[in-house]
């Protein structure tokens, strides 16, 4: 099997992956700020790094996968106040909702899922170290800030030059800062903030800045220097750039070897975001589409490419996934172990080892499905299920998928018992030699999105189309 190559944002190139400890991978991914329901952009991040950790384990690595939860933030505080509830009540509720969405999408839970509020002492310890090392200062307004110009390598991840950056590029100007580009490590508490929004420190009551949270959690759980750090493309600057400055400024060590960033989800060629008001929650999408269809929609696009969201693309994903399940419908796979020396296994592995090239891996699944359709071979069916399973797909009994209605069909389509009644009426018509009536029922069901297949022996199977 070829070596795994990962596109490293830091190097701006694909690189052969070499873990710091042979056979072990330590990976941190920036998770979700829990003040609302997860949207499709979140779904992409969740699925992408679920695929990454699945593949790393599949090729033999022992993986420690950490994905954090941001459970203290200005947006969280505002939403809790608006709702008249405590911060913990709000965040617990949306963490629960996030877990429900993950389960629906077939996301395997990370090995560790730290909440920012569980690591306040570690954050304060890192801030004090940065102050000791000359990278941090307490401003007149009580905030503790990071002095960006003190860190010589600032900009190495994003490629941005300090001289080219201006206050306002995702950085709020503040007269209390020594430099407009400096960013906050510890926010001084305001008098009107609710309970649970601040902690005691040598700097006064306050709460951590967003960036220090991930530095402290990553270093605490994975060590000062670890293998992979991931997140959405929008986090490359300033969040991940600032993480590097904080972590390396505090420890004096390289923070991360490989930086991975997934591309945006787009609607009408614009980034899907709450600020633009063009986002859809996972729950809204799952009302209309099967969760595995949504996962397949995400999986079949390379993780670094833009993902264009539309009903047309989701409908196409549903049709494509239906083709894969249909290939398995009447074939019982054998129970042999996956053999990477088989040609399809080799092509699949080569694709996944080429920076997780899921479009090519999915194409291999369709090649296999075509061969299964032609040969009805149990070995090929087993390979199809096994390889698809590495992507979190084709885990259901084929008929269960093919007969399951989408959310839209559940709202206005035929229920299974209604379909069976129509099939029984068609059987009766055929027995009475009323073939015109039998054809009418078949056509009526097809119009309603139900395809019939007459089997040897007189039985009839159905699936949704």
Curated annotation (Swiss-Prot):
Q: Which CDD domains match?
A: Anticodon_Ia_Cys, CysRS_core
Q: Which reaction does it catalyse?
A: tRNA(Cys) + L-cysteine + ATP = L-cysteinyl-tRNA(Cys) + AMP + diphosphate
Binding residues for ATP: 274
Q: Which UniProt keywords apply?
A: Aminoacyl-tRNA synthetase, ATP-binding, Cytoplasm, Ligase, Metal-binding, Nucleotide-binding, Protein biosynthesis, Zinc
Q: Mention one GO molecular function.
A: zinc ion binding
InterPro entries reported in the protein's UniProt record: Cys-tRNA-ligase (IPR015803), Cys-tRNA-synt_Ia_DALR (IPR015273), Cys-tRNA/MSH_ligase (IPR024909), CysS_C (IPR056411), Rossmann-like_a/b/a_fold (IPR014729), tRNA-synt_1_cat_dom (IPR032678), tRNAsynth_Ia_anticodon-bd (IPR009080)
Q: Which cofactor does it need?
A: Zn(2+)
Short name of any one Pfam family annotated for the protein: DALR_2
Q: Where are the transmembrane segments?
A: none
| Record EC number | 6.1.1.16
| One GO BP annotation of this record | cysteinyl-tRNA aminoacylation
Q: Which family does it belong to?
A: Belongs to the class-I aminoacyl-tRNA synthetase family.
Note the NCBIfam families from the entry: cysS
What is said about its interaction partners and assembly?
Answer: Monomer.
Q: What is this protein called?
A: Cysteine--tRNA ligase
Q: Which organism is it from?
A: Burkholderia orbicola (strain MC0-3)
